[in-house]
Regions:
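Bacterial Sec-dependent N-terminal signal peptides
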Residues: 1-15
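Histidine-/acidic-rich catalytic cores in large beta-rich domains
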Residues: 15-306
Length: 306
């Protein structure tokens, strides 16, 4: 029985190939748990894989670079601090997205805009952000251009999710991430706030929200009704700290990023949202540290909703 139990656990830990950023930089971990690729790299908040297999990621929180994986060569870059009118301005980039037409969407915090640039670095679309209290480090976390063409923005500092109409640039939907207790400083499980990190528009029209230091995942309707939630200690043996990434898999499961949770807690958790059963966890604190803020599953790259 003991042998069977260990075998099952090994299977559970070997379900996905992962690209992530940890304490030693970028890394790919295969389904057997082996690190098959790595590259020294500074901290990130967003990461993508292109159809050609190249990795697109932030560098120094202000530049987007495309990395050819085989030789680790940077083959394209865009520097938000030096291009298109931003010279000398305080700004950070926490989110970007490669688009189907080859352009790249970039959210520039501090100067308060979303831009789409072509591969020559020319702006082809610009949208002004609405921010209550602007700060380069807090204006945004993840931003996505969703299926209807609009932008869905997690405004960390404001504690709000806003949807911007692509054509007019106007905010057409806002959700205030709730506070259910007094704020508490820090980044770990004892911290508390409503500093949202991510928002994903689901196929049913609802929005799935990673509440950051609120330790919670919410599904809300367009009318802002909470219809599903996962709280900090709801899963047996798991404590959420700063909930970062959300990835909705083709089978409907959710993969949740659990940053700053400390030793003994998983960096990623996959659940069946209907039953809230834990399907898989990635617990590699010793190898990757306490600041894994973004990752993606390579085995469903291009098929998941993130």
């Amino acid at each position: 029985m003991l042998i069977l139990f260990l075998s099952c656990c090994t299977c559970v830990q070997a379900q996905h190939e992962i690209l992530l950023h940890g304490k030693n930089g970028l890394a790919v971990v295969n389904k057997a748990g082996e690190t098959t690729w790595q590259m020294p790299f500074g901290g990130i908040h967003d990461i993508h894989v292109l159809e050609n297999g190249n990795i697109m990621v932030q560098r120094n929180m202000h530049e987007i670079v495309e990395i050819e994986r085989e030789n680790k060569k940077i083959v394209w870059s865009y520097n938000s601090r030096t291009q298109n009118g931003n010279q000398g301005k305080p700004l950070e980039v926490h989110a970007f997205q490669p688009l189907g037409n080859g352009n790249v969407m970039i959210a520039e915090s501090g100067v308060g805009r979303i831009i789409e640039v072509n591969r020559d670095g020319k702006i082809v679309k610009e949208t002004k952000l609405v921010v209550d209290s602007s700060h380069p480090h807090r204006d945004t976390r993840l931003v996505r251009k969703i299926k209807n063409g609009n932008y869905l923005v997690a405004h960390e500092g404001d504690g709000k999710i806003r949807e911007y109409d692509f054509d007019s640039g106007k905010v057409i939907w806002t959700y205030d991430v709730p506070l259910t207790q007094n704020r508490a400083g820090g980044h770990g499980p004892q911290a508390y706030g409503n500093q949202a990190f991510s928002a994903v528009r689901l196929g049913n029209g609802n929005t799935l929200i990673g509440c950051g230091n609120g330790h919670t995942v919410l599904e809300v309707t367009p009318q802002k009704k909470i219809v599903w939630k996962l709280t900090q200690k709801e899963l047996s043996g798991i404590v959420f700290a700063w909930i970062t990434t959300l990835e909705v898999l083709p089978n409907g499961n959710y993969v949740i990023g659990n940053c700053h949770a400390g030793s003994g807690q998983p960096l990623l958790v996959e659940i069946n949202p209907k039953t809230k059963d834990v399907v898989w966890t990635f617990d590699r604190y010793d190898d990757f540290g306490n600041n894994v803020s973004n990752s993606l599953l390579l085995d469903v790259a291009g098929k998941s909703n993130r």
